[in-house]
Every structure is written in structure tokens, then in C-alpha cells.
Amino acid sequence: MNWILYVILPAVCIILGWTIRWLYARFQLSASEQRAERILQEAIKDAEAQKKEFLLEAKEQLIREQKQQERENRERRSDLQRFERRLAQKEEVLDKRVETVEKQEKELIKREAALDERTEILSGEEERYREELERISGLTQQQAKDLIIRDLEAEAKHDAVTIINKIEQEAQLTAEKKAQDILITTIQRLATETASDITVSTVSLPSDEMKGRIIGREGRNIRALETLTGVDIIIDDTPEAVVVSCFDPVRKEIARVALERLILDGRIHPARIEEIVQKVTREISQKVYEEGEKVLFDLGIHNMNQEGVRALGRLYFRTSYGQNVLQHSKEVAIIAGMIASEIGANVEIAKRGALLHDIGKGAETDSDKNHAEIGMELAKRINEDPRVVNAVGAHHNDIEPTCIESVIVQIADAISAARPGARRETMDNYVKRLENLEQLAEGFNGVEKAYAIQAGRELRVVINNEKISDADTKILARDIAKKIENDLQYPGRIRVTLIRETRIVEYAR
């Protein structure tokens, strides 16, 4: 019995619980359906309200657009009416103009008819006058036309020649003025040292006893110094001085410096001489390179081959007519650069060509060519621009200049060399040049005496008034000047002045 209770009671409880759960679920479902139905009804009402609101807004928008369209239509109709009124006014004005043009056309037709009538009359008169002119002049119309053309042609040629001469004169004056302006501007901008160092070859001695020490026992010291440096040491009767002679300026400088140091040191023997010479040689070699680099830096020139730099540096120890060649080359480069900038040429090419124009004087070679040819070969070897090579070779007209920069280098070289005080001659050459100048003038027939004055810049010639007349003086002066140009070399120009004096003496008794 008990087991029945234990089995049936739980079963009844389970069934009762499931039934209660089912009934609760049905109740919940019914409530959810009612809530959903209520929400749906509310949504339908809201949708209807929004629909009515949208329809109302749409109607209001349509009404506004209709009013806007009507307003625009009224404005367009108003514009169209105004346009039609203006068009009507223009048509009225055009009709008036057409009437005016028609009247003018009729008037022109009348005038044209009158002109045609007058033209016929004038043509007849012209033919009659032409026949009368031909009868009076004895020339046909074609002959008269040819005569007039010839006269006009001659007059036109004369006018053309006059105009051409005027243009040539103006061009010459303009060119001279422009050249003067360029040179004046260049010289005003040029600021270089006018005084150059004198490369001396005389070594001062503390006393004449030092000469014996320099010579050494059986001349071994002087032989060692001459052998190591390649110079000639001249010891003569000149008190307290020794002369160093050599054609190579660098070797002469090495010998001079080495000799001065030996004298200062006091130890003079072959071993010491060799040591000093080697040391000075290294120092001079370094100085050569430094001088070359210095001038390149001063001029703003870059990318120069080392061989070219050394050749430039060697010019520091070389002089020409007392002018330092490196300083001269630097000055020529500055002048060439200024001229090139004034006329629009290549400044870099002009400066390089001007700086290297005398580089052949510093080249280490035994060639018998002149310095322009040697310099041109050196410029080719160091891979310079062909225009630079041409400028170097053509600066003394040994070859034909092929570019404007070569001509600029020639001009700059002439300016630097001709500048007063830039160069000087030795006394012997100076006296000889003056003597040659006077002898050349005295070789002409009728010349009594010639005097070279103002350092050879002027030649005054006294002539015999019985052999040379006033009319012949101009010819003689020109002949003397031409012979000076052909036979002598001189800087600048020489003024030839002829003096012819006639003295007539009479006595009254």
C-alpha cells in the first residue's frame, strides 16, 4: 500500500504541475496577443496621422511652387514685353537708317555719273595736253618717263650713299664709344697691385771673407752648389756680394735661398750644401704649388689639373720686362673677365684663357717652340676647353682666333702690358732703342738731326728747309712713321714731329 502511495503521489504532482504551467503559458500568450494588437492599432493611428501631415506639407509646397512659378512667368512676360518694345524701337531706327542710306546711295550715283562725265572730259584734255607736251619737248611719253626714272634713280643712289655713310659714321662712333665705355668700366673696376716683386739674383755677404768659404778648398763647395742647383755662381770683385745666374727662375731661386741659409748657418761644406739644397727644393716646390692654388682661389677658378697648377706657380718666379708673369696673368684674367661680362661673352672661358695665356713660360720643357705653342700644348694636355686652348695659342696671333673669348684675351693682355709702369726695360735696351729710333730718322734725305724725347714716346726731327718744302713735310713724316712701324719694336705709340725753320736775314745800311 505504501509503495502505491510512493508511486501515484509523485505522478499526480507532476501532472498537476504540468497542467498549471500549461494554463499559465496560455494566459501569457493571450496577454501578449492583446498587447500586440494594441500596439498595432496605435501604429496604424500614427501612420494615418503622419500620412495626413505629409499630404498637408506636400500641398503647401505645391502651392508655394505654383506661386513662385506664376511670379517668374509674370517677370518673364514683363521682360519679353520690354524686349519687344526695344526691338520695335530698333526696327524704327533701322528703317530710318535704311532710308538715309538709300538717299545717300542715290546721291552717290548722281555724283558718280557727274565724275564719269568729268573724267571723260579730262581724259580728252589730258590726251590733248600730252600731245602738245610731246610736240613742244620733242620727247615721247616713254622717253620722258625713262628720263624721269633715271633722274630719280641717280637722286635715290645719292641719298642712299649719304644715308649709308651717315650710318657707318654713327656705327663707328657708337662702336668707339661703346669700346671706350667697356674699357673705362673695366679699368675702374680693376684693383691690382701695380708694384711687382723684383726677382734679385744677388746674395749679400757679411764680409768678403765669406767668398773664400763659399769657394771652399780647391773650389769643392762652389762646384757642389752649382752641380746640385744647376746655376752659375759668379764671384768677382764686387764687395760683399755674390751673383747667382741661371735661365731657370726656379733653380735660381733655390740656389739663392740655399746660399743665404748656408751663409746664415756658417757651416759650408758639400754634405751640408746637399742637405740644405734638398730642403730648399722641397720648400720651393711646395711654394710653387701654393702660389698656383692661391691665384686660382683669388680668381674663383676651379677644377684645374695639378700639372697646370704647378706651371702657374712657376710663373711666380719669372719676370718679363720687370713684370712678374704670374701677377701679369692674374691681372689679364681679371680684365678679361670684366670685358666678357660687359659684352655678354663666357666669363669663365675668358678668365681661364687669360690666366693660362703665358703658362708656356712656366712649363718644364726643352722645346724650341715659342711660349704660346708650348702653352697651347700644355692646355690640351690638362684637358682644358678648346676655346681656352685657342685663346692661349692665339694671344700673340700665332694662330687664328676662333671665338670671341680669344680676342678678349688679346685685348686684356695688351691692356695689362701697355699700362704705364707695368713693364720696364734695362738701361742698355732703353738706350739702344732710343739710338735706333734717332738713327732711323737721320737716315732720310733732308734730315739734319733727330731727337728721341719723352722716353722714346716722341721723335722730333729737324729738317733742312732748302731740301724739304712745306708740301713734302707731310710725306716725310708719314714715311718716317711707316719705317718705324716696320723696322722697330716699341710699346705704345711714337709721335713723329717735323721741325722746318726758315730764317731770312737782311741788313739795312
Swiss-Prot record:
Matches recorded under InterPro entries: HD/PDEase_dom, HD_domain, HDIG_dom, KH_dom, KH_dom_type_1, KH_dom_type_1_sf, Ribonuclease_Y, RNase_Y_N
Highest taxon above the source species: Bacteria
Membrane topology field: Single-pass membrane protein
Keyword Cell cycle: no
UniProt cross-references to SUPFAM superfamilies, sorted A to Z: Eukaryotic type KH-domain (KH-domain type I) (SSF54791), HD-domain/PDEase-like (SSF109604)
Molecular-function annotations in GO: RNA binding; RNA endonuclease activity
Enzyme class: hydrolase
Keywords: Cell membrane, Endonuclease, Hydrolase, Membrane, Nuclease, RNA-binding, Transmembrane, Transmembrane helix
EC number, UniProt record: 3.1.-.-
Annotated CDD domains: HDc (cd00077), KH-I_RNaseY (cd22431)
The keyword Phosphoprotein is annotated on this UniProt entry: no
NCBIfam families membership: HDIG, PRK12705.1-2, RNase_Y
Chain's role: Endoribonuclease that initiates mRNA decay.
Family indicated by similarity: Belongs to the RNase Y family.
Protein name from the UniProt record: Ribonuclease Y
Source organism of the structure: Treponema denticola (strain ATCC 35405 / DSM 14222 / CIP 103919 / JCM 8153 / KCTC 15104)
Lineage: Bacteria, Pseudomonadati, Spirochaetota, Spirochaetia, Spirochaetales
